Amino acid sequence: MEDFVRQCFNPMIVELAEKAMKEYGEDLKIETNKFAAICTHLEVCFMYSDFHFINEQGESIVVELDDPNALLKHRFEIIEGRDRTMAWTVVNSICNTTGAEKPKFLPDLYDYKENRFIEIGVTRREVHIYYLEKANKIKSENTHIHIFSFTGEEMATKADYTLDEESRARIKTRLFTIRQEMANRGLWDSFRQSERGEETIEEKFEITGTMRRLADQSLPPNFSCLENFRAYVDGFEPNGCIEGKLSQMSKEVNAKIEPFLKTTPRPIKLPDGPPCFQRSKFLLMDALKLSIEDPSHEGEGIPLYDAIKCMRTFFGWKEPYIVKPHEKGINSNYLLSWKQVLAELQDIENEEKIPRTKNMKKTSQLKWALGENMAPEKVDFDNCRDISDLKQYDSDEPELRSLSSWIQNEFNKACELTDSIWIELDEIGEDVAPIEYIASMRRNYFTAEVSHCRATEYIMKGVYINTALLNASCAAMDDFQLIPMISKCRTKEGRRKTNLYGFIIKGRSHLRNDTDVVNFVSMEFSLTDPRLEPHKWEKYCVLEIGDMLLRSAIGQMSRPMFLYVRTNGTSKIKMKWGMEMRRCLLQSLQQIESMIEAESSVKEKDMTKEFFENKSETWPIGESPNGVEEGSIGKVCRTLLAKSVFNSLYASPQLEGFSAESRKLLLVVQALRDNLEPGTFDLGGLYEAIEECLINDPWVLLNASWFNSFLTHALR
């Protein structure tokens, strides 16, 4: 029967039926007739809805596929086939928007023309018997019942068949075909006899007769009757299953399951060593922007034109000098590189027409900074086979680094609001179905909470830089192209604004493989004095390049302006993911949605509005040494977004490993909090796997510190 179902029905229908059976704890390998019945019912529901639309006059029309009018509003909302939570969300939404009475049981469809829920029945017995069972179960005059049989009979409430004759004939023909195909394979008799009556749990607890026989048939292997199986389940040891598996393994496997108690776990050991350093591809909280409002200059939108216009807004340039050298680099080369950028920008301004792109002269300082001719010569492996001591060159173990406070400050800053709007999500047309209406409402509420967030600025900055760098890497492979670091936003008043953070100079970029590296030098403006946290800026050479006048409450004050310069590198695959940083918005929105869904299923109505508009309610944000931190729903949105953005900015193998391994420990701790009496073996091995990922990455070290705070408060 299972093979027949998979051949006979559309794969999407089969997948939905599998999910439904899994949701109710039923095994499709055993209950094959049930599997076939669910697929049949799903197909009838879909056929009932197919091709039926409502036109602008509110009339029901039938439109065949590939018709340009197929964008009309669907007449039927399909509820059957969705998971229970989503199905109830749709039903609640329909009731809220149409005023329909909420049904006691999940119906199959909603008819927008007749404004009523529909229960579809497909029976192998007499239609009138099945109709009465359905009506008796539903006990509601507001749900319309429509029953089909495999013999071509049908029955509907008040003989109102809803659909036209031709649409119903299609359904009957399909059911008759299914019956014939089953009969040809000798499956029909078993299928016909296996139909159960419509019973509800409230009405009947005792299992007798056919149901009892079916229960006995549906047991796992090696159980003769339901009582034996019940006795086994009642005496089931939670961890016995693992011990049973271990006993079947090699005698060398010696794993004793230890109970996991509140006193069992220890904190994760963070490494000692010098403080960790900033390793993001661009400055975050320390970045400074030179901005122009309402840009309307010639060539507006061309990065080089925008950059020159932004540079002209600053008048405090001075002779640059080094204030914080890079310990291992030739710092004079970094200084000369910045002077070269200024000189070549000045040359452009003196030209009659500004070019769209600027390729830098290949000076000795840029060749050094971009690693030109520094890569070891590649030799074909076939030419080396005879060399007896051929080996990969030795590489040093990475130096262990300790957690530093700057990374927590960076994260806190990313969660804050700025005075600019960084995203405007395009409208995607008018909502037709209730689920689209809910989705749009959630998206709009979420956007309002995060559009001013600094993490959103980092997204747009990252998208721009990675897109520009990948384009230049492909279009000007041999050139040292100058790439302005630009972002665009709107002020609170709605005025457009173009911002310049600094410049990138790209090295040679013959990128054949996804992991081939392109070197670049970044030069970024900042007001942060690097001497305050020199360990953070280990990889940078910092110049003082000017003085900026800042307005404050006490009047104007002058602050030194710095330029953070470093050599860096990236690859095609990293730039590809950097270009897609907007995904962070989607990920954090989905996390918020799951919180709303949980609340909605408890209250049995969509709670989106209450969720975002109840300003007095606080939500857990995360763990700190002081305990569970709470905040408004907006703060939760921004914190989740910042976490997602930092996962992208600080992506690394260390983060992948720590996330995967610490999750295992987290699940055990959560099981303990839920009083599930978890057992573990080789807990020391798990700690080892977690701690080998804690090397020098600031974001991983911060996450490990947060995890320790969670352990402390979770196990009190």
Swiss-Prot record:
GO MF, one term, reads: endonuclease activity
Q: What is its EC number?
A: 3.1.-.-
One GO cellular component assignment for this chain's record is: host cell cytoplasm
Cofactor dependence: Mn(2+)
Q: What start-end ranges are recorded for coiled-coil regions in this protein?
A: none
The protein's role, per its UniProt record: Plays an essential role in viral RNA transcription and replication by forming the heterotrimeric polymerase complex together with PB1 and PB2 subunits. The complex transcribes viral mRNAs by using a unique mechanism called cap-snatching. It consists in the hijacking and cleavage of host capped pre-mRNAs. These short capped RNAs are then used as primers for viral mRNAs. The PB2 subunit is responsible for the binding of the 5' cap of cellular pre-mRNAs which are subsequently cleaved after 10-13 nucleotides by the PA subunit that carries the endonuclease activity.
- HAMAP family in UniProt: INFV_PA (MF_04063)
Subcellular location(s): the record lists: Host cytoplasm; Host nucleus
Q: Where is this motif: Nuclear localization signal 1 (NLS1)?
A: 124-139
Q: Where does Mn(2+) 1 bind?
A: 41, 108, 119-120
Please report which protein family the annotation says this sequence is part of: Belongs to the influenza viruses PA family.
Gene it is expressed from: PA
Q: Does the record's keyword annotation contain Metal-binding?
A: yes
For this chain's record, the cofactor binding note is:
Binds 2 manganese ions per subunit.
What the entry says about post-translational processing? Phosphorylated on serines and threonines by host kinases, including human casein kinase II.
Protein's UniProt name: Polymerase acidic protein
Top-rank EC class of the record's enzyme: hydrolase
- Organism, per UniProt? Influenza A virus (strain A/Memphis/4/1980 H3N2)
Motif extent (Nuclear localization signal 2 (NLS2)): 184-247
Q: What keywords does the record list, in alphabetical order?
A: Cap snatching, Endonuclease, Eukaryotic host gene expression shutoff by virus, Eukaryotic host transcription shutoff by virus, Host cytoplasm, Host gene expression shutoff by virus, Host nucleus, Host-virus interaction, Hydrolase, Inhibition of host RNA polymerase II by virus, Manganese, Metal-binding, Nuclease, Phosphoprotein
Subunit structure of this entry? Influenza RNA polymerase is composed of three subunits: PB1, PB2 and PA. Interacts (via C-terminus) with PB1 (via N-terminus).
